[in-house]
């Protein structure tokens, strides 16, 4: 706050710091065999424009910037160009790794990135470089936290907790629950907080009760890694990544959602969250993102009617489920493909000899495939901890 004094009256001016929350870019992610990098570039350009037109001071990126541990050179180029433009000449970017990112690889360029106002946390033990002549920059840092200040003297405290998988928590006591381990990690990131500024947590977690989409691995769905919203008591705002559907727990614990629609059940519009703080209070504004193709899920019982329906969704990616009494012919398949070049998934369900539906196994999730295989070999369902172990191994190989 600034106090302007004149000869006749006092004028109190409140300065507002604007903070943009985004996550789950998944740069390099494809849909089936379709390249989506041009869509991702367009959506990132849209975020840059929001930063410029809405006077954003600080950008928070809550993990999963890449889709794999070893992103392509093209994906890395898109990432670095985007965050450099978001930082511009006067903004700062604070970014953490997610479960799809290699935290060590992501943070390798942290010293150079900090010179551009970009602060990369690959683990909860990282410490950011401080100082610089930029208008918005790090003024203090320690293990797992950074304080960002601007030229007006306003500051915001960010407790940064990248995706805490079991490998990253292996030094913690094994008898503790996952939630208790996280509580201690969060407490470590509070070491530099003494009040007097907005108090934020930036993390990549699965909150109990969250709505999951098909584009996310179901590794957290057994509940072992679901954390209660009460874990975040005491923070003014919690900027989360991991779940692709925008959602919130109260007003100040939010998932911004993914950059694009990455699965056919993600029908909610994509967005970023813009925070406005005067140093004592925070308000939230949801700003829609319009870049990227729609993902549409359709069903029909007749191939010709399905072709007519497909023509209505030109420019979208489509998953079509056909429920037929007889197998689909090759000519019908060609007709459907010609009706919409965005048809990326064609699921045909026909009646079996006994009138039962025949479901293609390619429609099953990793968890369902594992359970089906286990039942076929051992004649019983696998234990939940065995399923979790399998999915953890699958994640490590991804």
Name each model feature, range by range.
Residues 6-90, 201, 392-398:
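N-terminal active-site segment of His-dependent metallophosphoesterases
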Residues 58, 276-398:
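Accessory, non-catalytic peripheral segments of nucleic-acid enzymes
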Residues 71, 94, 101-239, 243-247:
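His/Asp/Glu-rich metal-coordinating catalytic cores
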Residues 74-87, 110-121, 213-226, 251-269:
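Short, electropositive alpha-helical surface patch
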Residues 88, 194-195, 230-234, 310-313, ...:
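Short, conserved loop/helix-junction motifs that constitute active-site signature segments
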Residues 131-154, 253-317:
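Binuclear metal-dependent phosphoesterase catalytic core
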Residues 199-201, 229-278:
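Contiguous mid-protein beta-loop-alpha structural module that forms a pocket-lining wall or clamp
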């Amino acid at each position: 706050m600034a106090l302007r004094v004149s000869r006749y009256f006092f004028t109190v001016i409140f300065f507002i710091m604007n903070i943009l929350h985004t996550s789950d870019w998944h740069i390099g992610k494809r849909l089936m065999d379709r390249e989506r990098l041009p869509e991702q570039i367009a959506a990132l350009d849209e975020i840059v424009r929001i930063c410029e037109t809405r006077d954003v001071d600080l950008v928070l990126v809550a993990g999963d910037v890449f889709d794999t541990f070893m992103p392509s050179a093209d994906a890395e180029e898109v990432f670095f160009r985007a965050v450099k433009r978001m930082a511009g000449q006067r903004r700062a970017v604070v970014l953490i790794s997610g479960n799809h990112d290699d935290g060590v690889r992501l943070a390798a360029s942290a010293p150079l990135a900090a010179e551009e106002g970009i602060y990369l946390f690959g683990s909860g033990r990282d410490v950011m470089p401080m100082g610089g002549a930029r208008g918005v920059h790090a003024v203090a840092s320690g293990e797992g936290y950074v304080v960002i200040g601007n030229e007006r003297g306003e500051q915001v405290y960010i407790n940064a907790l990248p995706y805490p998988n079991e490998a990253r928590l292996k030094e913690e006591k094994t008898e503790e629950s996952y939630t208790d381990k996280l509580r201690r990690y969060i407490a470590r990131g509070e070491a530099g907080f003494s009040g007097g500024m907005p108090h934020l947590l930036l993390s990549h977690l699965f909150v109990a009760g969250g709505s999951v989409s098909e584009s996310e691995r179901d590794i957290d769905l057994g509940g072992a890694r679901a954390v209660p919203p009460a874990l975040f008591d005491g923070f003014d705002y919690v900027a989360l990544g991991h779940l692709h559907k925008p959602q919130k727990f109260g007003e100040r614990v939010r998932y911004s959602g993914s950059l694009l629609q990455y699965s056919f059940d993600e029908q909610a519009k994509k967005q970023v969250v813009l925070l406005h703080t005067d140093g004592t209070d925070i308000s939230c504004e949801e700003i829609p993102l319009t870049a990227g193709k729609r993902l549409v899920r359709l069903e029909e019982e007749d191939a010709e009617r399905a072709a007519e329906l497909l023509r209505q969704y030109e420019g979208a990616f489509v998953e079509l489920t056909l429920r037929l009494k007889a197998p689909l012919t090759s000519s019908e398949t060609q007709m459907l493909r010609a009706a919409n070049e965005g048809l990326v998934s064609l699921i045909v369900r026909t009646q079996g000899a006994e009138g039962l539906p025949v479901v293609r196994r390619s429609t099953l999730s990793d968890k369902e495939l594992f359970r089906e295989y286990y039942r076929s070999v051992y004649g019983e369902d696998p234990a939940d901890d065995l399923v979790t172990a399998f999915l953890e191994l699958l994640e490590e190989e991804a």
